[in-house]
Amino acid sequence: MSYLFTSESVSEGHPDKVADQISDAILDHFMVLDPHSKVACETLVTTGQVVLAGEVKSDAYVELQDIARDVIREIGYNKSAYCFDADSCGVLSAIHGQSADINRGVERTAPEEQGAGDQGIMFGYACRETPSLMPLTLDLSHALLEELARIRKEELHLMPYLRPDAKSQVTVEYSEEGKPLRIDTIVISTQHDDFIQPADATAEAQAIADAEMQARITEDIRRILLPRVLARYPEDVQRAFDSETKLLVNPTGKFVIGGPHGDTGLTGRKIIVDTYGGKAAHGGGAFSGKDPSKVDRSAAYAARHIAKNLVAAGVADEVLVQLAYAIGVAEPISIFVNTNGTSHVSLSDAEIAKLVDEVFDLRPYAIEQRLKLRAPIYRETASYGHFGREPRKVTKYFSTNSRGDVAHEVELFTWEKLDYVDTLRQRFGL
């Protein structure tokens, strides 16, 4: 019997994502000035206010207020009508030094023996539902909002009422064997200007104006947004959007009040959006604001890198990888692999895990080096998912007080590279 499965995403203007992006932008500035920085930065955003907290060990000095305001401005919160404006919001910092007790468990005389920054479990996942080897429900949810933001920033004349905050949700019908059959429901809630005024002050006139706005936005989503997003996908996905697919746009009827004025945002509150949309397990640790000595982040990236390369190599059609660490210990405590019955090799999942341990050095320092994580690469991860993204080289520019304007070439999303496929095929005899 077929079944339905759903994932959601949120836009860069969602309050929790505003917080994530500020935290990661601050991390990037520390990384560009001192790649050995230890950073744990948390952000809270609310009406007219940003609060920064956390722990840092670094030789760098960064302008926290300027960074926060730049991020807010780039997202699009640049009008006083939003009640959260880059130029007028307050920015308070309570960031202080890192605990010496934590640091003594991480730093070692030999860098390769660097201990894990904390205990914990981390998961990586890959499947064959999309070209990016990500779940279709989440991939579509991200794509819808990424394109909506692009329209808002680059082609605003098409949907001139758009504001930064938005959410999406995609439900897909799957076969009993777990293959996507059709897109059942798409939900999009997007913040907008109050662009149709009521004829008079009555509640009835307001309801009519609200209904007209909702109808206009729904039509624009159907006519402009959906065709652009579906065109990115193979024909089988395009066919999955059929005449029976339900489209729900701003189901409450109106979404004018939004962003940090509508809801308080916090770093690390969208961990399922950041990862696999509920299709795979999550260890519970958030990513944003954390330097790669925190295995919550770096080991989760390594686990995705392993899972994606295993699937791309043909070892299995679906792979879940779990890693576990103890604080201050370099080697992982355990490595677990689950292929969910989709393996194409004559090995048990436990035997696959043993080969993974032989092929990949999973000590924190080795992960940092292999994936080039001691670099200012994190702001880009903080919206539209950390996984399923296109690895690429870019030059990023930073304004600093100590070194002026700095240009830095980096590789983004290195954990998405399929650079171990040949090695794995050889080791698994494929």
Residue ranges of predicted features:
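Short, charge-patterned binding micro-sites
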Residues: V39-D59, I327-E331
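Conserved phosphate/anionic-ligand binding catalytic regions in large, soluble enzymes, centered on
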Residues: E8-V10, H14-A19, G115-T130, V256-A281, ...
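A structural-propensity feature for long, helix-poor, extended segments
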Residues: G48-V50, E154-K179, A313-E351
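C-terminal catalytic subdomain
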Residues: I271, Y276-L320, E331-N338
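Alpha-helical support elements that line or immediately flank enzyme active sites
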Residues: E8, E12-M31, A126-R150, K290-G314
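N-terminal, positively charged regions that mediate nucleic acid binding
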Residues: M1-A40, V421, R427-L430
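Internal helix-turn-beta structural module
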Residues: T46, E318, Y325-L430
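Glycine-rich, mobile lid/loop segments that gate access to catalytic sites or pores
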Residues: T6, D66, R73-I257, G388, ...
